[in-house]
């Protein structure tokens, strides 16, 4: 799951207890799913009287919702915990209590080690057990130091409240909705199967209920989330087997839900029904994040991706046949163990053929406990960096070319937030680009017709073309 998409970066979520004046600050690291998880933890804590603060200094509870994907992720968390230890000590000297919690994938991976290395931490809770966070905090209040990272037998989502409409409305007109968690693919570079567990799909009724609540709260665009979201499966109303495509058709029936997206996908799980949904559903935006990681069959095999470059390109061609205006995004890793110059050139050729509107690329870094960490022929850091620089230059060129190709097009723009200038609003294009427009007499949540007039560093500019819808 990509971690650097501008649309999907979350604010730092916070909470406060009106009766007891308890406040909580949640710092979110990493992917979109952590953003969603922070929101759900926020809602769960609200039942115990916590409400938001944007000032860590005044928080009674500081919660780090962590990510374990990047290199040295755990060390960065320990560094942050060192600063929090000092803050906790200072507050204690002033007669004020502050609790510290660590959640997310570093919590899952490190467990008891966090309490050993960071004694100031009160609670460590994993991504599959955060519905038990309020109980863990109660135990910590009684003097226990709590580690709860065992995979829950119960469905955590059944125990998590859905926010009231007023809170949903305050969060904006776009929302995330997790429908699937975990991964069974076991790519040799990836820690997700070890930190998030095996693939689990939420039931249809549960997903539809949450989506309807979001729409009632003013949400107009929902992004379905999963570590491998297109592996989602469930039972339809007559007990028939459903895939993600079927779920999208059902969600598109919800009145008031104007837009749907989903991320992140695996090429092996792009079935016919999902491709049909891209053809048929006006609400499903023409944007697809479909990681490939490498253009070399040899490296793809070493990564355990279970597809070839040709199969990936064939899939892209099928999708573009049914949805010619679709914008493609991807993930790439340079310097995977054993990658030669020829392998890297294969990756560049694949990028040239696909022509991405956006992509994310990283140097390979060993993740302890993954098969990739045990492979020989590790690529020198300098070569990894040189290849990454070449790849990113090509991807940036393609991104700029895609943005320039939008000039002159009329598009539907969902208005999301105020701009920097008076009467300016910022929205998202169907292709996930940030668009600035003078939208006098329009409101956040409107979908208006605009004409793209220019490009900026990371955004587009537009003029009004029609009235709001």
Curated annotation (Swiss-Prot):
InterPro entries (UniProt xref): Elp3/MiaA/NifB-like_rSAM, Methylthiotransferase, Methylthiotransferase_CS, Methylthiotransferase_N, Methylthiotransferase_N_sf, MiaB_methiolase, rSAM, rSAM_horseshoe
Chain ranges of the MTTase N-terminal domain: 22-142
Family: Belongs to the methylthiotransferase family. MiaB subfamily.
Annotated TRAM domain residues: 404-466
GO cellular component: cytosol
Compartment(s) of residence: Cytoplasm
Assembly mode: Monomer.
TM spans (from-to): none
Organism for this UniProt entry: Rhizobium leguminosarum bv. trifolii (strain WSM2304)
Binding-site list for [4Fe-4S] cluster 1: 31, 67, 105
Gene3D superfamilies associated with the record: Methylthiotransferase, N-terminal domain, tm_1862 like domain
Residues annotated as domain Radical SAM core: 169-401
Cofactor note: Binds 2 [4Fe-4S] clusters. One cluster is coordinated with 3 cysteines and an exchangeable S-adenosyl-L-methionine.
Taxonomy of the source species: Bacteria, Pseudomonadati, Pseudomonadota, Alphaproteobacteria, Hyphomicrobiales
SMART domains membership: Elp3 (SM00729)
Reported cofactor(s): [4Fe-4S] cluster
PANTHER family registered for this protein in UniProt: CDK5 REGULATORY SUBUNIT-ASSOCIATED PROTEIN 1, MITOCHONDRIAL TRNA METHYLTHIOTRANSFERASE CDK5RAP1
Keywords: 4Fe-4S, Cytoplasm, Iron, Iron-sulfur, Metal-binding, S-adenosyl-L-methionine, Transferase, tRNA processing
Function noted in UniProt: Catalyzes the methylthiolation of N6-(dimethylallyl)adenosine (i(6)A), leading to the formation of 2-methylthio-N6-(dimethylallyl)adenosine (ms(2)i(6)A) at position 37 in tRNAs that read codons beginning with uridine.
Catalytic activity, reaction form: N(6)-dimethylallyladenosine(37) in tRNA + (sulfur carrier)-SH + AH2 + 2 S-adenosyl-L-methionine = 2-methylsulfanyl-N(6)-dimethylallyladenosine(37) in tRNA + (sulfur carrier)-H + 5'-deoxyadenosine + L-methionine + A + S-adenosyl-L-homocysteine + 2 H(+)
A Pfam match: TRAM
Main location: cytoplasm
Keyword S-adenosyl-L-methionine among UniProt keywords: yes
GO molecular function: 4 iron, 4 sulfur cluster binding; metal ion binding; N6-isopentenyladenosine methylthiotransferase activity
Name of the gene this protein is made from: miaB
UniProt name for this protein: tRNA-2-methylthio-N(6)-dimethylallyladenosine synthase
EC number: 2.8.4.3
């Amino acid at each position: 799951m990509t971690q650097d998409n501008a649309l999907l970066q979350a604010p730092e979520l916070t909470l406060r207890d009106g009766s007891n004046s308890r406040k909580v600050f949640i710092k979110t690291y990493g992917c979109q799913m952590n953003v969603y998880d922070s929101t759900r933890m926020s809602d769960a804590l609200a039942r115990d009287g916590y409400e938001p603060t944007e000032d860590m200094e005044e928080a009674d509870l500081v919660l780090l919702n962590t990510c374990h994907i990047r290199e040295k992720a755990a060390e960065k968390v320990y560094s942050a915990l060192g600063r929090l230890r000092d803050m906790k000590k200072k507050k204690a000297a002033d007669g004020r209590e502050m609790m510290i919690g660590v959640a997310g994938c570093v919590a899952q991976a490190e467990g008891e080690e966090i309490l050993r290395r960071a004694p100031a931490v009160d609670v460590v809770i994993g991504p599959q057990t955060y519905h038990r966070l309020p109980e863990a905090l109660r135990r910590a209040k009684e003097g226990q130091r709590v580690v709860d990272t065992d995979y829950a037998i119960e469905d955590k989502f059944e125990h998590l409240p859905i926010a009231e409409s007023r809170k949903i409305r305050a969060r904006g007109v776009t929302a995330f909705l997790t429908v699937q968690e975990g991964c069974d693919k076991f790519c040799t570079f990836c820690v997700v199967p070890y930190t998030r567990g095996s693939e689990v799909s939420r039931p249809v009724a549960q997903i539809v209920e949450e989506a309807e609540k979001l729409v009632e709260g003013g949400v107009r665009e929902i992004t379905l989330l999963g570590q491998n979201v297109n592996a989602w499966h469930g039972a339809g109303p007559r007990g028939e087997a459903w895939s993600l495509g079927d779920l999208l058709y059902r969600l598109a029936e919800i009145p008031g839900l104007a837009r749907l997206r989903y991320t992140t996908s695996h090429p092996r799980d792009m079935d016919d029904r999902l491709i049909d949904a891209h053809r048929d559903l006006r609400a499903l935006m023409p944007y697809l994040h479909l990681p490939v990681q490498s253009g070399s069959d040899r490296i793809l095999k070493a990564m355990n991706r279970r597809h070839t470059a040709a199969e990936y390109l064939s899939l892209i061609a099928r999708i573009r046949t049914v949805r010619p205006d679709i914008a493609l995004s991807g993930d790439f890793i340079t310097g995977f163990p054993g990658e030669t110059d020829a392998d890297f050139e294969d990756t560049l050729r694949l990028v040239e053929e696909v022509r991405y509107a956006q992509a994310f690329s990283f140097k390979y870094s060993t993740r302890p406990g993954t098969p990739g960490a045990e492979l020989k022929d590790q690529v020198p850091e300098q070569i990894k960096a040189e290849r990454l620089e070449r790849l990113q230059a090509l991807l940036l060129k393609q991104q700029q070319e895609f943005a320039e190709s939008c000039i002159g097009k009329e598009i539907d723009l969902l208005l999301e937030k105020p701009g920097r200038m008076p009467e300016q609003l910022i929205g998202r294009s169907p292709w996930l680009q940030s668009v600035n427009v003078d939208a006098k007499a329009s409101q956040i949540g409107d979908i208006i017709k605009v004409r793209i007039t220019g490009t900026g560093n990371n955004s587009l500019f537009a003029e009004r073309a029609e009235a709001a819808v």
